[in-house]
Each structure stands twice: as C-alpha cells, then as structure tokens.
UniProtKB/Swiss-Prot annotation:
It is an enzyme of class 4 (lyase). It catalyses: (S)-4-hydroxy-2-oxopentanoate = acetaldehyde + pyruvate. This is 4-hydroxy-2-oxovalerate aldolase 1. CDD domains: DRE_TIM_HOA (cd07943). Coiled coil: none annotated. The keyword Manganese applies. The keyword Manganese applies. The record marks 17 as: Transition state stabilizer. Belongs to the 4-hydroxy-2-oxovalerate aldolase family. GO terms for biological process: catabolic process; L-leucine biosynthetic process. Mn(2+) binds at residues 18, 200, 202. The active site is at 21 (proton acceptor).
Amino acid sequence: MMNLQGKKITVHDMTLRDGMHPKRHLMTLDQMKSIASGLDAAGVPLIEVTHGDGLGGSSVNYGFPAHSDEEYLGAVIPLMKQAKVSALLLPGIGTVDHLLMAKDLGVHTVRVATHCTEADVSEQHISKARSLEMDTVGFLMMAHMASPEKLVSQALLMEGYGANCIYVTDSAGYMLPDDVTVRLRAVRGALKPETELGFHGHHNLAMGVANSIAAVDAGANRIDAAAAGLGAGAGNTPMEVFIAVCDRMGIATGVDVFRIQDVAEDLVVPIMDHIIRVDRDSLTLGYAGVYSSFLLFAKRAEKKYGVPAREILVELGRRGMVGGQEDMIEDTAMTLARERAAAAHKAAA
C-alpha cells in the first residue's frame, strides 16, 4: 500500500510552454499574463514560459509564435507574486545567448532538454546555467526509449555537468506506472541525495496522474502538470486533477485545490483551439510511443496528402522518430501516399 502522507513536492506548470503546442505557439500576451497570474494566485510555485520547443524555437520547422520569448517572459515575470518562472532550452535550438537573455529577464530555472540517449550535448548549456547560479535541470526526453540502466548513465552525465535536478520525461505518454517506477527508482538510486528528481507526463493513455503518483512514490519531488491538461498530444498531466489526488493522499503541493480548478475552467478551457482529449490520434501517440508534439504536424499532413494521421503516427513510431525530426513527418506522409497510390493502381490493373 502506497503511503505518501506528508511528502512535499514541487508542482511545475506547463500550460504556457507545452500548452503552446496545441495553440500553435500563438498565445497572446494577455492570455499568458492572465493564466500566469491565476496560477501564481493558486499557489503554483514554478511556471514555464517559452515557445513550445523552448527558447529560440521560433522557426519554419517548429512554428512561428505570436510573440518572442523575450516578450512573453518580460510580460509574465514582473506580475509574479510568489511563483518563479522557468524556461526550456533544447541544445541545437536554444543557444547560450538565449540563456543569458532569460537570466537577464529574471528566469529562475532553466531546463536543458535532450533526447534520452544524448545527454552529452547538454554540457555547455548546463554548465553555463550553473555558473549563472540558476536552478539547473537536465531533462531527458522520450525516456520510454531507454532502459533504466541507460537513463542512469545519461542522468549521471547531466548531474556531472552541474544539473541540480534530473527529469525523466515521458514525451510520448507511452509509459505505464510500472515503467515509471522502474526508471525513476533506478535514477533516484544513482544520483547524489541532494540532486532532485522530476517527472513529466503526457496523458495520451490517460495515465498522466497515475504515472505522476508512481513517480512521487519512486522518489520524485518535482512533477510537471498543466491546467486543464493544455499540452501536446492529449495534453500533460491535468494539474487540477493531480492536485486533487495529491490532496486526497496527503501529498503537500501548496496549490489550492479549488483555485487551480478555476484557472483550468475559467481561463484555459476557453482559449483552447480544440478540446484537449484522448482521441484516436493522441491515443496512437501513446500506444505507438511517438513524440506528443508530432500530433498537429500529422493532422496537417493528413489534410495535405490524404493519409490518416493515425497511419502516419504508427509509421513514425515504427521508424523510431524522435523530437527534432518534425520535417520527416511530411516525408513519411508523402511516402505513405505514394505507397497507397501504387497499391490502388495495382488493384485497379
């Protein structure tokens, strides 16, 4: 029987960063400010604000945002009464200059994200963030693709570069609670006791809350979630549900159970371009182990090439595509469309 009574955790909000994916990075400054202020008032201690793909994500490959990272951060940070603001940075997209800009604007936490087997590309960014005395997080994405032993080796690299917290990230929403437990226990056992451990979930198999609780039980003390689940795929772990479950279990989050519901219902749901839910395409992300932010790219390719998004996503999973290969989605759709046309031609002959 799990007993987490009295355990303290830090909840990290994703609404204004992972939530940029389903908004196609087009949140307005007013939307950002009102949601961030609501989260702050609800007691959320850490709020991530950047382009969905992190600092410097504005590009043809990832999508152009309504405003620059500087504008979003500059609008939100001065409004915060108790919450700190974090920024995501993917080496190869974000640079040390972006990191310095974020620090100058008052960003407290930087999360340096790599594919779960490529931690070595994070050294420059992690060591720089630590030298700036920032709260520095190593963020291992698509963690279902690596064994617990491999994740341990990658986590130790990031810790060695200076990260004071390591995240195991279920970018595809593929993991089940046992997958989370075995990975987080292994990483927790290998890290220094003072190094924190985090978990980032997606709700593609509706496991976001269960996986996050499993993570806490395995030793995680930072958990990502989003108000109304606003995030890529079927969204992140829905914050208001997670907070209610924590409250029931006696896990201390410092977040007000009812205020966070109001933020989700009154501020986040009304700005959704589509309802964030487990539909056949987002379910396929979780089932096939595909990067959650590929969802809208696959839906777009379906319209363009007439190949169902689900087929595209299954093929991407078969090919083992990872974050950063967004350009290959179109390529995959074209290949499948050609194969379909050839099969139809053969059948007609």
